């Protein structure tokens, strides 16, 4: 049975490193959306709580309910208002037209569009948005934005930072004691975080984005069968790989149905133990040189991301939630 191992010490090390950069665990918002980027939100929640994290962000109400026992504050980022919101949670207000659709007395964080143009209210429309919120029964407790290019060396990051500062000045005229957060994983190590802000950390908490961090997740598969592949014999669909000599091969219990990108047999896809995948990946299995009962498929998503010309996020979040995840 395939298995995901979560390195508890590595995760705790990363959070301590991040908290030191920010100033405290109290200013840290751990983003646990999409099953904590494939790592297992319910598995990691008690670890974060025990270190002092009290604020997390998720995608939906369903995700919030899975971990609500662990955290005092849970922000739901991608909610479509339905009028029956849970007062236990905080909801992102992504569009000003949604103000009247929320249940009364619900806590909200106002999303500001500072230049990404995906969700949120433009700074130019902020005064109008504030008027609508003040005339409603919603409880504005925070305001935030998202940087589109914090990991790229262009000027848009600084433009967005300036726009958010403008938005903060405006909203502070009408509300006090708001919680602000703008810096995401990519922005965390790119400069000083304003003293009046929290920091949302996503993939960086799992060891990506800074060389001082440690990878948390490693993916393993277990052997289904083994055989001697004789010289000239092929393996898998289409016979893409043909043995140049007699070799001992094995089939392992992980395939593209488990959320992996489908390897088509072209190029060398290096596994976590240094072996290469042989032939096309099947729905529920793959083959390689016999590596024992258990094989590490990957422990660094960057390697697979480079091979498949994508980003490490996509490699990790696609991992099937039904794969067992254990702390090691």
Swiss-Prot record:
| EC number assigned by the record | 5.1.1.1
Q: Which reaction does this enzyme catalyse, per its entry? A: L-alanine = D-alanine
Q: Which GO terms describe its cellular component?
A: cytosol
Query: Which residues does substrate bind?
Result: 118, 283
Task: Give the keywords, sorted.
Answer: Isomerase, Pyridoxal phosphate
Positions bearing N6-(pyridoxal phosphate)lysine: 33
Q: Which InterPro entries match?
A: Ala_racemase, Ala_racemase/Decarboxylase_C, Ala_racemase_C, Ala_racemase_N, Ala_racemase_pyridoxalP-BS, PLP-binding_barrel
GO BP terms: namely:
D-alanine biosynthetic process; peptidoglycan biosynthetic process
GO molecular-function annotation terms?
A: alanine racemase activity; pyridoxal phosphate binding
Task: Name its co-factor(s).
Answer: pyridoxal 5'-phosphate
- Per the Swiss-Prot or TrEMBL record, the active site comprises 33 (proton acceptor), 237 (proton acceptor)
Pathway named in the protein's UniProt entry: Amino-acid biosynthesis; D-alanine biosynthesis; D-alanine from L-alanine: step 1/1
The main enzyme category here is isomerase
NCBIfam families in the cross-refs: alr (TIGR00492), PRK00053.2-2 (NF000791)
**HAMAP family, per this entry?**
Ala_racemase (MF_01201)
What family does the entry list?
Belongs to the alanine racemase family.
Q: What's the stated role of this polypeptide?
A: Catalyzes the interconversion of L-alanine and D-alanine. May also act on other amino acids.
Q: What's the protein here called?
A: Alanine racemase
């Amino acid at each position: 049975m395939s298995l995901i191992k979560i390195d508890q010490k590595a995760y705790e090390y990363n959070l301590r490193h991040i908290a030191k950069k920010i100033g405290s665990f109290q200013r840290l918002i751990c983003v646990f959306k999409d099953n904590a980027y494939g790592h297992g939100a319910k598995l990691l929640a008690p670890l974060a709580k025990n270190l002092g994290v009290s604020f997390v962000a998720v995608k939906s109400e369903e995700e919030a309910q899975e971990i609500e026992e662990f955290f005092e504050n849970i922000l739901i980022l991608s909610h479509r208002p339905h009028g029956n919101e849970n007062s236990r949670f905080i909801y992102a207000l992504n569009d000003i037209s949604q103000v009247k659709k929320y249940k009364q007395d619900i806590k909200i964080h106002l999303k500001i569009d500072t230049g990404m143009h995906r969700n949120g209210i433009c700074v130019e429309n902020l005064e109008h948005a504030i008027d609508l919120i003040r005339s409603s029964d919603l409880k504005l407790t925070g305001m935030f934005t998202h940087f589109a290019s914090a990991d790229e060396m262009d000027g848009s990051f600084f433009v967005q930072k300036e726009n958010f500062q403008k938005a903060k000045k405006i909203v502070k005229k009408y509300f006090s004691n708001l919680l602000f957060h703008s810096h995401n994983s990519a922005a965390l190590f790119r400069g000083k975080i304003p003293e009046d802000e929290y920091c949302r950390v996503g993939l960086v908490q799992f060891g990506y984005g800074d060389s001082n961090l440690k990878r948390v997740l490693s993916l393993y598969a277990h052997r289904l069968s083994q055989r001697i592949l004789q010289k000239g014999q092929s393996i898998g669909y289409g016979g893409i790989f043909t043995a140049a000599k007699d070799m001992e091969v094995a089939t392992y219990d992980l395939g593209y149905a488990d959320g992996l990108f489908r390897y088509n047999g072209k190029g060398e896809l290096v596994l976590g133990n240094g072996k290469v995948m042989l032939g096309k990946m099947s729905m529920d299995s793959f083959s390689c040189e016999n590596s024992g009962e258990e094989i590490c498929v990957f422990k660094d998503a960057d390697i697979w991301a480079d091979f498949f010309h994508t980003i490490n996020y996509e490699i990790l979040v696609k991992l099937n939630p039904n794969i067992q995840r254990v702390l090691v």
